[in-house]
């Protein structure tokens, strides 16, 4: 496993989470429950939007893609974490490590772009309500989703190819629970300046600019709803925006703090906790915040259940 270049390294070792042995089973059960909640919650959203014609709108098109992204985002890291906790085998093959990094970047970036699309959809719905249908046409919505997939695929592939050209020498221990890009760069024994510059530049395009666009959209929304005379309408709009912004702040806050503004004395434990927030907690909370508390989603669930009961009663 030791060697002078990347071809001699057959695998990496994931240190995982700093958990005491006596807490291992409890943490395993907790993460398994959180992962299953994420899967079931996001799958429920996707199925309901697919089955109920009332939800075939731009907002729920973006939401179904966001749920798919959350589902895949968690599936990139959590199953491997659970496997390592159960088998006590921290190794991950070199190719699998780069593959995990690729899909981690892909679905993480995809969520960033979809959050922008959702913010824009709500901006148009509130600020240009009379022209909403004309502006948010099916072609525009599909184009926004397709563009999100294309850009994130390119970005993830770029970082993966740049990582694959690096040399890894003696140290193959990753102090994380997944193949984190910044952790891999610290293990490289070749020049990583190109990688670091690409992370800084592309990070601004992929993370910071979408975050600013979301803030700009909601600033316009707040400005618009303050002019609405109905206090009920204002409360409803603020409630919707508040839920969305809470998840946006959680996701972008940890990502920006971890990758774009790292502190010189940041500990591995702190980085791991921050990573757990946006890889495990946020995808689990999204179904509850975005949909399961939504009246349209509850109505769709009721209609689907009623249709099933009617079908089986025939």
UniProtKB/Swiss-Prot annotation:
SUPFAM superfamilies membership: Family A G protein-coupled receptor-like (SSF81321)
Gene Ontology BP annotations: signal transduction
InterPro entries recorded: GPCR_Rhodpsn, GPCR_Rhodpsn_7TM, Olfact_rcpt
Cysteines paired by S-S bonds: 97-189
Extracellular side: 1-25, 80-100, 159-195, 260-272
Localization annotation: Cell membrane
Topology of this chain in the membrane: Multi-pass membrane protein
Molecular function, one GO term: G protein-coupled receptor activity
Residues bearing attached sugar chains per UniProt: 5
Cytoplasmic topological segments: 50-57, 121-139, 220-236, 293-314
PROSITE patterns membership: G_PROTEIN_RECEP_F1_1, G_PROTEIN_RECEP_F1_2
A GO CC term attached to the entry: plasma membrane
The keyword Acyltransferase appears for this protein: no
Keywords (A to Z) from UniProt: Cell membrane, Disulfide bond, G-protein coupled receptor, Glycoprotein, Membrane, Olfaction, Receptor, Sensory transduction, Transducer, Transmembrane, Transmembrane helix
One Pfam family of this chain: 7tm_4
PANTHER family (alphabetical): OLFACTORY RECEPTOR
Family note: Belongs to the G-protein coupled receptor 1 family.
Protein task: Odorant receptor.
Name of the featured protein: Olfactory receptor 1E1
Gene name, Swiss-Prot/TrEMBL: OR1E1
């Amino acid at each position: 496993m030791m060697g002078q270049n990347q071809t001699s390294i057959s695998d990496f070792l994931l240190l995982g989470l700093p958990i005491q042995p006596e807490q291992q089973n409890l943490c395993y059960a907790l993460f398994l429950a959180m992962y299953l909640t994420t899967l079931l919650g996001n799958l429920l959203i996707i199925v309901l939007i697919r089955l109920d014609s009332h939800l075939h709108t731009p907002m729920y098109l973006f939401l179904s893609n966001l749920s798919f992204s959350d589902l895949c985002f968690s599936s990139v890291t959590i199953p491997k974490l659970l496997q390592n906790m159960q088998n006590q085998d921290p190794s991950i093959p070199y190719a699998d490590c780069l593959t995990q990094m690729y899909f981690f970047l892909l679905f993480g970036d995809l969520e960033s772009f979809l959050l922008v699309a959702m913010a824009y959809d709500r901006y148009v719905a509130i600020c240009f309500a009379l022209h909403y249908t004309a502006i948010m046409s099916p072609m525009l919505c599909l184009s926004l989703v397709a563009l999100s997939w294309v850009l994130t695929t390119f970005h993830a592939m770029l970082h993966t190819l740049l990582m694959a050209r690096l040399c890894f020498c003696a140290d193959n221990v990753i102090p994380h629970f997944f193949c984190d890009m910044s952790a891999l760069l610290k293990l490289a024994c070749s020049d990583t300046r190109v990688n670091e510059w690409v992370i800084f530049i592309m990070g601004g395009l992929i993370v910071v600019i979408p975050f600013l666009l979301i803030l700009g959209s909601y600033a316009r929304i707040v400005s618009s709803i303050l002019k609405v005379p109905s206090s009920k309408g204002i409360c409803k709009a603020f409630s919707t925006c508040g839920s969305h912004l809470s998840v946006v702040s959680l996701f972008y806050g940890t990502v920006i703090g971890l990758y774009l503004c790292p502190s010189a004395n940041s500990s591995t434990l702190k980085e791991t906790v921050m990573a757990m927030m946006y890889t495990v907690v946020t995808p689990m909370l999204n179904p509850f915040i975005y949909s399961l508390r939504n009246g349209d989603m509850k109505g769709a669930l009721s209609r689907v259940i009623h249709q099933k009961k009617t079908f089986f009663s025939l």
